[in-house]
Amino acid sequence: MAPKQDPKPKFQEGERVLCFHGPLLYEAKCVKVAIKDKQVKYFIHYSGWNKKSAVRPRRSEKSLKTHEDIVALFPVPEGAPSVHHPLLTSSWDEWVPESRVLKYVDTNLQKQRELQKANQEQYAEGKMRGAAPGKKTSGLQQKNVEVKTKKNKQKTPGNGDGGSTSETPQPPRKKRARVDPTVENEETFMNRVEVKVKIPEELKPWLVDDWDLITRQKQLFYLPAKKNVDSILEDYANYKKSRGNTDNKEYAVNEVVAGIKEYFNVMLGTQLLYKFERPQYAEILADHPDAPMSQVYGAPHLLRLFVRIGAMLAYTPLDEKSLALLLNYLHDFLKYLAKNSATLFSASDYEVAPPEYHRKAV
């Protein structure tokens, strides 16, 4: 019997593609193609991503047990000393399976736009629902750390978190003659582990006030912030060091703080801004093209990150124990924000946008 032939790659080296990274699609380039164990993989470079502007969740089949394992999920900040650990790399490029790669065609570009829009709407709706008393919400009223598999949920399709459960098995799907690779990617996405971080009760009102000040009252957070993200993170790191942590834990805190900063700088422009803020963001980019946004923005935008960061961590295929351990670090930082909320959050940090700005924001 003749040996089974290797599968034929759908994409070629140098080809422009779209690649799933987290819940979104990004423009990318196929740098290399490899076939191993009858599976096609591609070495992907994300267009426009570099050490200053990009971060990706680390992928490993290992279970994280030590502090060094945990911080390996975050990228090494530029200029930091090299850490010899198998989960850390210096490149933002990565090997991905064929199921995450799509052709760069109009239909998939439309899907990219739809996913981006849905992601932004889900973010806004999650913040709005957080203000409603007596109702379950998708993100703000979960347990401290919640890690669960979406495919194991028994909720009726289409229901939100407040929906009823159903014990009735779903009828089997009709078999398709051909499998759409786009649909395959979406199903894979829906089956991934869902990671949610609880926002402390003391901080929830600030999420709502922040939304109200910007979207309803048409005010803008004053930039540059009186106390920027870099300064907040530095204060937190110093606070943890002052409590007599061991060298290993101190190292972990430093790396987690650096990771939060990198995630913030990457996600701000695409996932952490309201529509009304975009002209302001464009002006900041024009005036300070080389400045990291963590040196410009402050506590309210940093808090928004923790509503969204779970979606990125969900694409790190680690077991529940490892994810919970990582999230403990993030939640500890949130407790620090809550403890210092009186000095970090204030409505006086916002200002009414001038008439000419309103014309830009239309």
From Swiss-Prot:
Chief subcellular location: nucleus
Motif (Nuclear localization signal): 135-146
N6-acetyllysine carried by residues: K143
Residue span of region Disordered: 113-182
Domain Tudor-knot: 12-51
Region annotation (Interaction with KAT8) ranges: 26-62
Region of interest (Interaction with RB1-1), ranges: 164-230
Record has DNA repair as a keyword: yes
Region (Sufficient for interaction with SIN3A): 133-266
Subcellular location as annotated: Nucleus
Every MRG domain range: 191-362
Start and end residues of each stretch annotated as Interaction with RB1-2: 323-344
Function: Component of the NuA4 histone acetyltransferase (HAT) complex which is involved in transcriptional activation of select genes principally by acetylation of nucleosomal histones H4 and H2A. This modification may both alter nucleosome - DNA interactions and promote interaction of the modified histones with other proteins which positively regulate transcription.
Protein name: Mortality factor 4-like protein 1
Organism: Homo sapiens (Human)
